[in-house]
Amino acid sequence: MKGFLIHADKCMGCHACQIGCKDEHCGNCWMPYAQEQPESGQFWLKVNQKEHGQCPQVKVSYIPTPCQHCENAPCIKAAENDAVYRREDGLVIIDPKKAKGQEQIVKACPYGKIFWNEELEIPQKCTGCAHLLDDEDAPISVPRCVDNCPVHVIEFGELDELDLEGAEVLHPESGTKPHVYYKGLPKKFIAGTVFTPADEEIVEGATVTVTNGTETYTDTTNSWGDFWIDGLADDEWTVTISAAGKEKVLTVSTVDEDKGLGDIALV
């Protein structure tokens, strides 16, 4: 079975994969795999960008997101007349002819990766560039998104040949068993800048400990007084900052969002 392994922590947001997908499918009809992708309104692969934290402690994550080519694909169950099928290699394909008029296929996807083409009245999505995989004379033998990435964020191949140790899937609660795996998905962080209000100077070398009772992380403020602890679970944390006999204790929640604490006075 084929699938994708996406290294989210390596993605720099250049959108080359997204552009490659557009270049491959806009203006090109790859029947029986897919009709043309509209130039606007559809991104069969999209780099989802999200800002984390609060100013000035902010970072941006980029997560390339194609069709998840699920083993238990809801779109297959929602389709009539076998309009959506799963190939022997694991790729999920929408038959453009059989799927005409079946808008319920779009609504079935829990990932929002199936799009409705108003003009053609068909659902459309990523095909895994099956037309390239099946064509021995094609210039490449992998999906365009894979070929286009300059830093090898996206891998494609047999699942048992990909290094999936520690990999995750999106929305595992859906029970769809996606064949798109991720490493380096963003976890929560707590960050801040420590200073002493008496002389309005930053504190270098302060020890910062973050614990939820079972996990403990430690950092030391740098020459700018900054600390940054990431890889945190969604939880309630006790943050202890200590330096030169002074200590400050904060209770911080990362349940809903990352926390950039801004300037923290150590008194």
Each model region followed by its residue ranges:
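Extracellular beta-sheet/turn segments enriched in Thr/Pro/Gly and aliphatic residues
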Residues: 253-267
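Flanking helices and flexible, charged tails adjoining ferredoxin-like Fe-S electron-transfer domains
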Residues: 29-66, 76, 96-196, 267
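A short, solvent-exposed loop/turn motif at the edges and junctions
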Residues: 240-252
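Ordered, amphipathic secondary-structure segments that act as subunit-interaction surfaces
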Residues: 69-79
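Short, ordered, surface-exposed loop/turn motifs in non-cytosolic proteins
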Residues: 188-190, 197-213
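Short, acidic Ser/Thr/Gly-rich low-complexity loop/linker segments typical of extracellular
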Residues: 212-226
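Short Pro-Gly-centered beta-turn/loop motif in secreted/extracellular proteins
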Residues: 203, 226-238, 244
